[in-house]
């Protein structure tokens, strides 16, 4: 199959008019106008001048088109995944909100059921789950429900990992909210990516968390102290730790 009349991204980091040849579900070749094949020899699809790029991966969003991942239904996940695929997002790791532990466990279990049952290739692949709460800071809660915020806890984290059958890929914490935060990070970092999320941590606390094994920061600059030269905070710690994404 040949997808013609598309803009392809080339080795010189520019979009150029071209085509993409497919063999089964694999890309066989990428062409520009300079080396275009004879399209009469293959089944063709007209890209109508669209940009042809690899599928995007969305690691942090809560829902779309009236559905929320925390609705806790397979139908909601299916509609979310189908819409995401329609706009070029081919893999997703939707985020949870700060909800009661038992409710979060149910949401995770439903996601596992969905992933096992789904065979529809028109939907974005559910690669994982991003847990934005409940281990966050009341001072930087944003739209999260303060009533359900709790300090990071290894036992509860293990419950989430078990309920999700390994689907939870990120879990956010506010390290300043617990004296056990460093031990928490060291205990779970081999099982899940620990992120700093909705945190009021200062530079020293954030740096210690990253040095202990946390490796991600949630919506940098937002829901954390502002960056300044005298108080660099979480933002400064992120830029001082090369392994943090």
What are these regions (language model features)?
Residues 162-245:
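Active-site core of metal-dependent hydrolases
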Residues 73-76, 107-110, 153-155, 229-235:
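Charged helix-capping and loop-helix junction motifs
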Residues 6, 20, 25, 49, ...:
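Divalent metal-coordination and catalytic microenvironments
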Residues 2, 8-53:
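Histidine-rich, glycine-flanked metal-binding segment
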Residues 62, 78-107, 123-137, 164-176, ...:
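Divalent metal-dependent hydrolysis catalytic cores, especially in the metallo-beta-lactamase
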Residues 137-162:
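Conserved phosphate-binding/catalytic loop of the ribokinase/pfkB sugar-kinase fold
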Residues 66-72, 86-88, 93-103, 223-231, ...:
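Active-site loop-to-helix "anion-binding N-cap" substructures in soluble metabolic enzymes
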């Amino acid at each position: 199959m040949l997808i013609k009349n598309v803009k392809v991204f080339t080795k010189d980091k520019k979009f150029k008019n071209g085509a993409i040849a497919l063999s089964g579900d694999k890309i066989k070749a990428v062409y520009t106008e300079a080396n275009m094949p004879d399209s009469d020899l293959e089944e063709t699809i007209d890209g109508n001048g669209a940009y042809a790029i690899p599928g995007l991966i969305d690691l942090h969003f809560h829902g779309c088109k009236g559905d929320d991942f925390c609705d806790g239904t397979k139908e909601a996940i299916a509609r979310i995944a189908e819409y995401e695929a329609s706009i070029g997002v081919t893999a997703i790791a939707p985020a949870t909100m700060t909800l009661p532990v038992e409710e979060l466990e149910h949401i995770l279990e439903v996601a596992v059921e969905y992933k096992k049952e789904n065979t529809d290739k028109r939907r974005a692949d559910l690669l994982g789950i991003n847990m934005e709460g409940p281990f966050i800071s009341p001072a930087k809660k944003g739209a999260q429900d303060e009533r359900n915020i709790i300090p990071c806890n290894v036992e509860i984290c293990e419950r989430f990992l078990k309920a999700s059958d390994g689907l939870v890929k990120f879990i956010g914490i506010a390290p300043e909210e617990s004296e056990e935060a460093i031990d928490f990070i060291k205990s779970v970092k081999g099982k899940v990516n620990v992120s700093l999320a909705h945190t009021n941590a200062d530079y020293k606390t954030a740096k210690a968390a990253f040095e202990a094994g946390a490796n991600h920061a949630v919506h940098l600059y937002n829901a954390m102290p502002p960056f300044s030269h005298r108080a660099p905070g979480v933002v400064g710690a992120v830029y001082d730790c090369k392994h943090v994404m």
